[in-house]
């Protein structure tokens, strides 16, 4: 873009792109590609430098600061050439590395170009100053521009998202991320500004402004100041930091028109309301109010303008240099006005804000001698209570003495000062948070419009990553959110991108960018993660922050790499744990986390809030439900659950919703970078920026953009869009596959063919190539358009020339005609022609114009209706697309639920393992306790033995004492000694008894402990036994199924030879089952047909009854009318005879008078004949026009209806194909996921298989039932449509007849009036006749003119109709071409998906085939296992497909229900039309009566005329000629009178005929309505029956295999019962047929009676008595017929009940057969699973063997290395010995030299200085050599030591490898044992499958027999039917 093109950006141009001059200067700058480099630097990360020299892998360079550095060569990175300076897309850099990206951003930032593209996303750096790049001029310049056509900007990202939304018809999202202070909020505002301005530009003509409110665009923009005032605050890093997250969705209509908007907010930082750090401040709204810009606010809120008067808002800073609080207050207040807030709402918000400030000033103190708090002054409490609409005393009482519920009673609790202060802060935070949420909801209400919306663009602005000195719970939530968003970015940019390459079959090596953050996310949110433990601790009443910390340490310290113990630094707040986030390590302080998470409130004060007189406050807390709130019935559970939800759980729920929304959109990423910590404009802190670039994945994103293919297009779209580049590459006439066409097209273009790749469904382009193709396309289009314009100009010029020639010819003709006219204009006959000619056409054309106008009006209404219908269809299509998006969201939610279920399953498996470990530990403890118990029992026995010995000693002593009592005196000394011994013994005994007691107590304690432990062990063993039993049952069932499967496989191999024939047999079984299902459906259909016929006969009987009643009523009416007609006719006859007599007398007189006026009479007759002819022509023309208009109207309506049906069909086809496409994609995903799941866990697979089989059976039954109901509904709909069409056609015919009759009536009345006027004129005078002649001529002229006008209107109408038809044809072709094209594309996608699926299956088979190289003996078994794995995958895919098809069927059923409701509404409307027609019929009757009255008046007037004629005859008696003329007039009048009477009679007859038709139509309407209601009831009953059947199927599936025998016996019993029921049904049917035959006879007789009645009606004048007798006969027969019909109805109901019973039993039998078949298939699937496990184990064995071999090779290599090292060591030792020898030699030489030196000294003393100098030089050389040799010797010693260490390491490694080899060998042996065990299990499963197969065949045989019997019974029923028909026809013939 040159400077002239940049002029469109105005003053923003230099801030967006380099000028041409700068580019030229950069290109001429000196640059050496080999010397100009980047080198690393400690402070600046990297600096520019020039290479001075290169030596030995090191480079010496001079930096740009003049410093010389030496670095390794691999640390030196090349600079890019000067033309890449300040490049707009860093993906285009030649050398892509960290310093290149850093310096490009730095240089652009220095020129204030803050936006830079980085591959697929945009990087922006906060300028910390205002730049003129956001004005309206810049917005207009970016509108509609491609990304490559304009400089990088947030507006370009926004416009691209907008264009993608319109072209791809997909929701978009713009994710603006970065650290706090990086400029996210400003960029969010700019995005919203762009969309608002674009919408305003595009919709200025239709913009409407509500009074008091702004436009929608203004409201969207003004939502920001309001949100910022209440949600933004100053932080350490940002003066205007958003302390909440927001996701703004801007909704657009189908055409891109702005429709509405809504805002979702996340995680408002409530704690800031009452606490701020020193360098921060509270939310802006507090300081805006205190700015005194609106003094009335200070008065209203009872506050001063000093922030330091209020404790809550003055803990940090109170002013910000970059923010003018006064101006911001006015902006906030104005925003409220624009958003439509009322003054009451605004004042309420200000009052609550002021009340929070007063809350912070409330003080409390301890009561004397008590620990309870009391208010220390009530002034602030009074103010806050006044502002909140509360009672101050109640507020203070609620704070100091809240009421707490204890049991069922409320108790007043005393609070200390600390508790009261905490409650005050919590209430202030809760009020502020709820007020903020209410404000967001109120804004959303304002932004919600009723305009249709289809797509949205979401803008996410959420708090950036935060690392403060003091990080609490809020920082954890914010950082966790940023982790999830960064993971979403990484997954979208790196994982999904590369996975798509693999799916599309592009050669691609997966690049691991090391950006997986899942470990940190799992640590926070997974079960037993940080938030889970926090929520668990909140559940326990005695939990504290320290117990929470202890649990964290127990679960994660040392176990998770992201969880660390923090290092507490002096001067910083204490930290309790540290987390390693993607942006750095954060130390968290957990003080108060439990309280913050539970967020408790003082419920006494909350109750006061609910009763507040301030409406806003009471609304905020109206729905608050605390722990003590009484629960209402029916709502208690919901309220309790919602009130207990913690802050962390709510945040996770909102975050998951946000991530789901983002996944359903196409994301655009904007990375905001903070340049420095000091907020200095233009300064880049290199380490800070590099840290952000690394964390944000900027470099990785550029690399994958460079290496990968960021642009991709479907083959069909590419071919359609770029075929224009070379049309010859794709021939027009022949069909070429889209992929081949794209390959040919790209191969024929002059581009780099390495820059693109062909996938399965898309063509992939490297960065920049698609832009080149777009440029080529634009050039090609411009050339084509230029050529078209040239050709168009030529055609237009030729047309203009042709017009000039035609104009010349026309002028010549006109001149010739004028000359001819001038020659004849004075001719008298021509003058007469000029006078008469205009008069002929005027009247006729006026009438034609009137009719044409009416016709035009009708056609216009029809056209408007068709347009409305088209709009409805378009709206319906939009709603269907919306439903598709909703379904995609539901599918995404279902996938998330599935993932959660898998995680829970994994957790359960882990819990099982832990429980088993605990059980093992408890059993070990039990064994220890038992050993201790045994020791104690042994000690106890020993002590008991000692006690018994002591007792025996005591007994002996007592005996001796008794013996020596006699010798007492003699043996006193002995007694004393003995007593002393006794005392000692007693003491010993006492000690022993004490010890015994202690031991007994210890023993008892041990027994108790043992009993407790035994109880625990029993419970654990019970649990273990249950688990083991469950596991054993599962394993037993698996083993049994494996045995059955093995038996089956052996049988199949014996019978068919290989596994493929087995699959064919399974397919045969399925085909048999399908045939059985089809036969069952056929039987059901035939039974339904029988029921329908019976019901039709019932309906016919009821209709006949109704017709009889109506005919009776009609007969009575006809009798009355006949009587009236007789009297009227008698009067008319009498009048006619009188008139005839009078006319005869007049004729006699006239004959005498003669024929004086014969000439006038002849002229009159001619005029009358001409008049009649013109009138007939006019009537014929009008009839013809009406017929053509009706035909055209009908044709137009049919075409519109046909188009509507075609559109519906095309939409259904499109939806079906799209669903099939998504299903194929999901099936492919399911195949891969099922493979992974099979490998992961056997238990998981078994469970999933069972559920899938159950679902498959359920869905299959549902699908069949749904298909039946859908077929019924379609047939009903078709029938109703045909009936409706027939009725509408009949109504049209009736309308035509009625209009014809009304026209006839009008003509007759007109004729009567004309006759009257003519009689008066002829009687009065001859002059009146001349006047009448003139008026008749004038009338003729008017009629001709009217006729001409009508013809012109007709032509105009035909033109309009042809135009409408052409538009209809255009629409039809458009829809057909679009649909065909879309269908072809979807078919191609379907084929490609099928090909991909087939390729995936082939790849799986190939991978499985590789495993067959284990051993030759296992080859056959391995192949079978692989095939079975394929079967498992197919069954899973089939189950998933059935599940999806079931959902599709449910959706189709809902659509049909909707269509049925629409047809019901159409039926009601047609009934309304019928009623309106009946009212019109009554009007016609009234008109007919009025015409009769007019006839009477005419007759009276006729009498008067006759009297006048008699008077005239008396006057003209003298003239015979006059009499003759009057005689002629009399005859003429008589003839006209007869014609009038006949016309009147015909009109009466036609009216009666029309009345009969209308009555019949009403009857048919009523019958249709009754039939529809009956069918609806039947369908409801069938659906209910299907529901019950489904429940029965579920119950039957839940029963075990043990019920199989019972089901077989039940089947036999049912079979017998069915046979009996069939016999009974045959008897009942024969009886019903007899009754039906009799009813038919009676119907025929009734029909004959009706015919007689009709004849009697025609002859009612002659035979009134006969008619009465026939009516009596009809009444008697009608009563008989009603009685017989009642009996017939009872019989039909009985047969219906028996048929339903038989049908139900047949369904149950088929369900049991299906159950057996599903069990068989489940056994087969389980066998496949076991064999898959076997193959997995074999692959593990193979891997282990391979590892063993690798280890052996490593050991060999290590041994060879050791040998080599030993040789080297030996060499080193030899060299060392050689050096040692050399050293000794050198020492010897030194001694010799020393000796020589002595001699030399002596010589020197003797003989000269020169010799001395030489010797000294030689000594120095020798000393140098000695030093060098010593150094070499030391180095050789070091090398020897290194080699010795290397030898030791190698020997140790060989020993380790040997041990690993032994372990692997043991593992191989174990795995082989498992393989053998699995083989045995597979054989047992095969045996069981054989038994089930035999049972299935037996049941199938029984089912076949039952069906044969049903066929026999059906044939008998058909015979009986035929007989009944024959009997009925015979009866009719006899009658």
UniProtKB/Swiss-Prot annotation:
One of its GO terms (cellular component) is myofibril. Residues 32-81 form the Myosin N-terminal SH3-like domain. Gene3D superfamilies: 1.10.10.820, 1.20.5.340, 1.20.5.370, 1.20.5.4820, 1.20.58.530, 6.10.250.2420, Kinesin motor domain, Myosin S1 fragment, N-terminal. The keyword Acetylation does not apply. The modification Phosphotyrosine is found at residue 1308. CDD domains: MYSc_class_II. Residues 1907-1935 are annotated as: Disordered. SMART domains: MYSc. Residues 1923-1935 have a biased composition (Basic and acidic residues). Limited proteolysis of myosin heavy chain produces 1 light meromyosin (LMM) and 1 heavy meromyosin (HMM). HMM can be further cleaved into 2 globular subfragments (S1) and 1 rod-shaped subfragment (S2). This is Myosin-7. It comes from Sus scrofa.
């Amino acid at each position: 873009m040159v400077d002239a093109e940049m002029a469109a950006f105005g003053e923003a141009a230099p801030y967006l792109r380099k000028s041409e001059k700068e580019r030229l200067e950069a290109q001429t700058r000196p640059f050496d590609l080999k010397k100009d480099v980047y080198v690393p630097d400690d402070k600046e990360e990297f600096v520019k430098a020039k290479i001075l020299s290169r030596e030995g892998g090191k480079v010496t360079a001079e930096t740009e600061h003049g410093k010389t550095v030496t670095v390794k060569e691999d640390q030196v990175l090349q600079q890019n050439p000067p033309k890449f300076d300040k490049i707009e897309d860093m993906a285009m850099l030649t050398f892509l590395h960290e310093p290149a990206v850093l310096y490009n951003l730095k240089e652009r930032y220095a020129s204030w170009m803050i936006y830079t593209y980085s591959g697929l996303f945009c990087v922006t750096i906060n300028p910390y100053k205002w730049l003129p790049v956001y004005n309206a001029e810049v917005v207009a310049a970016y509108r509609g521009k491609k990304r490559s056509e304009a400089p990088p900007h947030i507006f370009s990202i926004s416009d691209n998202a907008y264009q993608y939304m319109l072209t791809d018809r997909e929701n978009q999202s713009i994710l603006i991320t970065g650290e706090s202070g990086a400029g996210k909020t400003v960029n969010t505002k700019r995005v919203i500004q762009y969309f608002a301005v674009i919408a305003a530009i595009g919709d200025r003509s239709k913009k409407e402004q509500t009074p008091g409110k702004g436009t929608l665009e203004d409201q969207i923009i003004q939502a920001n100041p309001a949100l910022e005032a209440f949600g933004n605050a100053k932080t350490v890093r940002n003066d205007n930091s958003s302390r909440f997250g927001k996701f703004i969705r801007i909704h657009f209509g189908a055409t891109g028109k702005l429709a509405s908007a809504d805002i979702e907010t996340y995680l408002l930082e409530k704690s800031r309301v009452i606490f701020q750090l020193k360098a921060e401040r509270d939310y802006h709204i507090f300081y805006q109010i205190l700015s005194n810009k609106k003094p009335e606010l200070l008065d209203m809120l009872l506050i001063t303008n000093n922030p330091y008067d209020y404790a809550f808002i003055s803990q940090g800073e109170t002013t910000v240099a970059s923010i003018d609080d006064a101006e911001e207050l006015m902006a906030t207040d104005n925003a409220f006005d624009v958003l439509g807030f009322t003054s009451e709402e605004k004042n309420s918000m200000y009052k609550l804000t002021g009340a929070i400030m007063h809350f912070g000033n409330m003080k409390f103190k301890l009561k004397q001698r008590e620990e309870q708090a009391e208010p220390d002054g009530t002034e602030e409490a009074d103010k806050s209570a006044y502002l909140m609409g509360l009672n101050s005393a109640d507020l203070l009482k609620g704070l100091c003495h809240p009421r707490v519920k204890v049991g069922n009673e409320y108790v007043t609790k005393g609070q200390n000062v600390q508790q009261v202060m905490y409650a005050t802060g919590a209430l202030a935070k809760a009020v502020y948070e709820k007020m903020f949420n209410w404000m967001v909801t109120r804004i959303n209400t304002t932004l919600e419009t009723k305009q249709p919306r289809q797509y949205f663009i979401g803008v996410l602005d959420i708090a950036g990553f935060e690392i403060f000195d003091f990080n609490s719970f809020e920082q954890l939530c914010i950082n966790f959110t940023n982790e999830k968003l960064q993971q979403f970015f990484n997954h979208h940019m790196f994982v999904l991108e590369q996975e798509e390459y693999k799916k599309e079959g592009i050669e691609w090596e997966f690049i691991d960018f090391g950006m997986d953050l899942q470990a940190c996310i799992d640590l926070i949110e997974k079960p037993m993660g940080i938030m889970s433990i926090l929520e668990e601790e909140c559940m326990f009443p005695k939990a504290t922050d320290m117990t929470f910390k202890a649990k964290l340490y127990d679960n994660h310290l040392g176990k998770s790499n992201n969880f660390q113990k923090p290092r507490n630094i002096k001067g910083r707040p204490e930290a309790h744990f540290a987390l390693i986030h993607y942006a750095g390590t954060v130390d968290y302080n957990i003080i108060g986390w439990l309280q913050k998470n539970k967020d408790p409130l003082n419920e006494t004060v909350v109750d006061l809030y609910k009763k507040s007189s301030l409406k806003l406050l009471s609304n905020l807390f109206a729905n608050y439900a605390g722990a003590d709130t009484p629960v209402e019935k029916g709502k208690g559970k919901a309220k309790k659950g919602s009130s207990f939800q913690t802050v962390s759980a709510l945040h996770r729920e909102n975050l998951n919703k946000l991530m789901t929304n983002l996944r359903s959109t196409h994301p655009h990423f904007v990375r905001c970078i903070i340049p420095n910590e000091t907020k200095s404009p233009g300064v880049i802190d290199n380490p800070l920026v590099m840290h952000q670039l690394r964390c944000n994945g900027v470099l990785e994103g550029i690399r994958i953009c460079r290496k990968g293919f960021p642009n991709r297009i479907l083959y069909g779209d590419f071919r359609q869009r770029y075929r224009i580049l070379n049309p010859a590459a794709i021939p027009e006439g022949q069909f070429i596959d889209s992929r081949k066409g794209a390959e040919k097209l790209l191969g024929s273009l002059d581009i780099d063919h390495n820059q693109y790749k062909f996938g399965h469904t898309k063509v992939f382009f490297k960065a920049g190539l698609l832009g080149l193709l777009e440029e080529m396309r634009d050039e090609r289009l411009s050339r084509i358009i230029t050529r078209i314009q040239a050709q168009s100009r030529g055609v237009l010029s030729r047309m203009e020339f042709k017009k000039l020639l035609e104009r010349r010819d026309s002028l010549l003709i006109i001149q010739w005609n004028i000359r001819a006219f001038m020659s004849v204009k004075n001719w008298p006959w021509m003058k007469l022609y000029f006078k008469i000619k205009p008069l002929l056409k005027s009247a006729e054309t006026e009438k034609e114009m009137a009719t044409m106008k009416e016709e035009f009006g009708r056609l216009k209404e029809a056209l408007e209706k068709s347009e409305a219908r088209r709009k409805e269809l378009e709206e319906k299509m939009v709603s269907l697309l919306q439903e598709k998006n909703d379904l995609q969201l539901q599918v995404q939610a279902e996938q998330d639920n599935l993932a959660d279920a898998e995680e829970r399953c994994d957790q359960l498996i882990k819990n099982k393992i832990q429980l088993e470990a605990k059980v093992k530990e408890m059993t070990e403890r039990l064994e220890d306790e038992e050993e201790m118990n045994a020791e104690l029992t042994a000690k106890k026995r020993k002590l008991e033995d000692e006690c018994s010995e002591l007792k025996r000693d005591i007994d002996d002593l007592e005996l001796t004492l008794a013996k020596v009592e006699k010798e007492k005196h003699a043996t006193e000394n002995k007694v004393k000694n003995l007593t002393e011994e006794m005392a000692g013994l007693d003491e010993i005994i006492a000690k022993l008894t004490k010890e015994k007691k202690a031991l007994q107590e210890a023993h008892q304690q041990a027994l108790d402990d043992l009993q407790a432990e035994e109880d625990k062990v029993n419970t654990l063993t019970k649990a273990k036994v249950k688990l083991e039993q469950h596991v054993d049952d599962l394993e037993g069932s698996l083993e049994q199924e494996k045995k059955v499967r093995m038996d089956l496989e052996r049988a199949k191999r014996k019978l068919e030879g290989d596994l493929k024939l087995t699959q064919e047999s399974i397919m045969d079984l399925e085909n048999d089952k399908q045939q059985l299902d089809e036969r069952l459906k056929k039987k059901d259909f035939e039974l339904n047909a029988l029921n329908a016929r019976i019901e039709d006969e019932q309906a016919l009987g009821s209709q006949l009854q109704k017709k009889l009643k109506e005919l009776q009523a009609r007969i009575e009416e006809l009798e009355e009318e006949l009587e009236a007609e007789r009297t009227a006719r008698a009067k008319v006859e009498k009048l006619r005879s009188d008139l005839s007599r009078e006319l005869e007398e007049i004729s006699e007189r006239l004959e005498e008078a003669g024929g004086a006026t014969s000439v006038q009479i002849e002229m009159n007759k001619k005029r009358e004949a001409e008049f009649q002819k013109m009138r007939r022509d006019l009537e014929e023309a009008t009839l013809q026009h009406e017929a053509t208009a009706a035909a055209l109207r009908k044709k137009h309506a049919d075409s519109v209806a046909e188009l509507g049906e075609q559109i519906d069909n095309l939409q259904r086809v499109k939806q079906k194909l799209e669903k099939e496409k998504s299903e194929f994609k999901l099936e492919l995903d399911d195949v891969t996921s099922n493979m992974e799941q099979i490998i992961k866990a056997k238990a998981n697979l078994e469970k999933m298989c069972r559920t899938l089989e159950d679902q498959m059976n359920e869905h299959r039954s549902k699908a069949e039932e749904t298909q039946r109901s859908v077929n019924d509904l379609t047939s009903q709909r078709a029938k109703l449509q045909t009936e409706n069409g027939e009725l509408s056609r009949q109504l049209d015919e009736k309308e035509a007849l009625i209009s014809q009759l009304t026209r006839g009536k009008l003509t007759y009345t007109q004729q009567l009036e004309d006759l009257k006027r003519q009689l008066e004129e002829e009687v009065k005078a001859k002059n009146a006749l001349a006047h009448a002649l003139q008026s008749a001529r004038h009338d003729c002229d008017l009629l001709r003119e009217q006729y001409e006008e009508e013809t012109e209107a007709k032509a105009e109408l035909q033109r309009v109709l042809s135009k409408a038809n052409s538009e209809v044809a255009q629409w039809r072709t458009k829809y057909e071409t679009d649909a065909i094209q879309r269908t072809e594309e979807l078919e191609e996608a379907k084929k490609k998906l099928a090909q991909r699926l087939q390729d995936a299956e082939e790849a799986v088979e190939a991978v499985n085939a590789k495993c067959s190289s284990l051993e030759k003996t296992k080859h056959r078994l391995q192949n079978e296992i692989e095939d079975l794995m394929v079967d498992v995958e197919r069954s899973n895919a089939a189950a998933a497909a059935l599940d999806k098809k079931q959902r599709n069927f449910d959706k189709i059923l809902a659509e049909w229900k909707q269509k049925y409701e629409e047809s019901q509404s159409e039926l009601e409307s047609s009934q309304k039309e019928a009623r309106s027609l009946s009212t019109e019929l009554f009007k016609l009757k009234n008109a007919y009566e009025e015409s009769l009255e007019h006839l009477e008046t005419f007759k009276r007037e006729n009498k008067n005329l006759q009297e006048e004629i008699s008077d005239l005859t008396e006057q003209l008696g003298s003239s015979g000629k006059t009499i003759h003329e009057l005689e002629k007039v009399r005859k003429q009048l008589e003839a006209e009178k007869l014609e009038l009477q006949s016309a009147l009679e015909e009109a009466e007859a036609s009216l009666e005929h029309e009345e009969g038709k209308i009555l019949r139509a009403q009857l048919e309407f009523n019958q249709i309505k009754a039939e529809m209601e009956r069918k609806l009831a039947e369908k409801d009953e069938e659906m209910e029956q299907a529901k019950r059947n489904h429940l029965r199927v579920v119950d039957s599936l839940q029963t075990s295999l043990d019920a199989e025998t019972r089901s077989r016996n039940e089947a036999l019993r049912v079979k017998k019962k069915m046979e009996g029921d069939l016999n009974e049904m045959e008897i009942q049917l024969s009886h019903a047929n007899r009754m039906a035959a009799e009813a038919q006879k009676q119907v025929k007789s009734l029909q004959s009676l009706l015919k007689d009645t009709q004849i009697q009606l025609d002859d009612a004048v002659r035979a009134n008595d006969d008619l009465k007798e026939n009516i009596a006969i009809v009444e008697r027969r009608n009563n008989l017929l009603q009685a017989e019909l009642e009996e017939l109805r009872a019989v039909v109901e009985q047969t219906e009940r028996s048929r339903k019973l038989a049908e139900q039993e047949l369904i149950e039998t088929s369900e049991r057969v299906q159950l057996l078949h599903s069990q068989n298939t489940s056994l087969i699937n389980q066998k496949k699973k076991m064999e898959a496990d076997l193959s997995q184990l074999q692959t593990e064995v193979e891997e282990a063997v391979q590892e063993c071999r690798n280890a052996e090779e490593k050991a060999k290599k290590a041994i060879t290395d050791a040998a080599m090292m030993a040789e080297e060591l030996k060499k080193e030792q030899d060299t060392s010995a050689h050096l040692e020898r050399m050293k000794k030699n050198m020492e010897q030489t030194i001694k010799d030299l020393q000796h020589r030196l002595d001699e030399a000294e002596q010589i020197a003393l003797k003989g000269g200085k020169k010799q001395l100098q030489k010797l000294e030089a030689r000594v120095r050389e020798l000393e140098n050599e000695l030093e060098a040799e010593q150094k070499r010797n030391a180095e050789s010693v070091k090398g020897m030591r290194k080699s010795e260490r290397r030898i030791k390491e190698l020997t140790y490694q060989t020993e380790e490898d040997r041990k690993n080899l032994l372990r692997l060998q043991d593992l191989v042996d174990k795995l082989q044992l498992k393989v053998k065990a699995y083989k045995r299990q597979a054989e047992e499963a095969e045996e069981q499958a054989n038994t089930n197969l035999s049972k299935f065949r037996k049941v199938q045989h029984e089912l076949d027999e039952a069906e044969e019997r049903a066929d026999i019974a059906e044939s008998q029923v058909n015979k009986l039917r035929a007989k009944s028909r024959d009997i009925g026809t015979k009866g009719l013939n006899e009658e």
